[in-house]
From Swiss-Prot:
A biological process term (GO) from this entry: photosynthesis
Annotated positions binding heme b 2: H89, H190
PROSITE patterns in alphabetical order: CYTB_NTER (PS51002)
Subcellular compartments: Plastid thylakoid membrane
GO cellular component, one term: plastid thylakoid membrane
Name used for this protein in its record: Cytochrome b6
Organism: Cuscuta gronovii
Superkingdom: Eukaryota
Gene: petB
Family: Belongs to the cytochrome b family. PetB subfamily.
Free-text remark on how the cofactor is bound: Binds 2 heme b groups non-covalently with two histidine residues as axial ligands.
Binding-site residues for heme c, renumbered to this chain: C38
Residues annotated to bind heme b 1: H103, H205
One Pfam assignment: Cytochrome_B
Length: 218
């Protein structure tokens, strides 16, 4: 017996790896499933690409109002393959939004939101909201004219709400006006808070799909 087999047997004895693998590979797939049922998986793939490329850019990006734009320029012009990483990040973000929208339409048109899959639908809708939030927060991080005015408009929307509007605006911006605190908050949301929440809801979403299976045809 080779050392590799000994190591495998050691883990197998404690974790029952083969049983887990058999459970994953032997899951029943209904005959009506087609390529359109892969849209959710493609959305997940885009998210993983976002995580990888976004993590790579954190080594160079500086969330400081006076340096953010220059750091993005450095990524695009001077950093090795920086232009490629940022371009992949941008295009995979657009692809993720598109695949998510198509996935929602597919689920709705095939009745995948009906009993007993209501909670799966709810978590999916929440993931859609989180995806849109990624777009809003990430759009402003270059801190160019487009990003600055976008963040100013977005954070100013709650101001129309009576009584709580002004405090909500200040909470989003971190101060009375758009500035360093705003950029810091949006950077934290985009790189830590939103990814963490998204991963939690994705796990819930996938576990429910795993438990309930794929919905049948109409």
């Amino acid at each position: 017996m080779s050392n590799v087999n000994k190591v495998y047997d050691w883990f197998e004895e404690r974790l029952e790896i083969q049983a887990i693998a058999d459970d994953i590979t032997s899951k029943y797939v209904p005959p009506h499933v087609n390529i359109f049922y892969c849209l959710g998986g493609i959305t997940l793939t885009c998210f993983l690409v976002q995580v990888a490329t976004g993590f790579a850019m954190t080594f160079y990006y500086r969330p400081i109002v006076n340096e953010a734009f220059a750091s993005v320029q450095y990524i695009m012009i001077e950093a090795n393959f920086g232009w490629l990483i940022r371009s992949v990040h941008r295009w995979s973000a657009s692809m993720m939004v598109l695949m998510m929208i198509l996935h929602v339409f597919r689920v709705y048109l095939t009745g995948g939101f009906k009993k007993p899959r209501e909670l799966t639908w709810v978590t999916g809708v929440l993931l859609g909201v989180l995806t849109a939030s990624f777009g809003v927060t990430g759009y402003s991080l270059p801190w160019d004219q487009t990003g600055y005015w976008a963040i100013k408009i977005v954070t100013g929307v709650p101001e129309a709400i009576p009584l709580i509007g002004a405090p909500m605006v200040e909470l989003l911006r971190g101060s009375a006006s758009v500035g360093q605190f705003t950029l810091t908050r949006f950077y934290s949301l985009h790189t830590f808070v939103l990814p963490l929440i998204t991963i939690v809801f994705m796990l819930m979403h996938f576990l429910m799909i795993r438990k309930q299976g794929i919905s049948g045809p109409l």
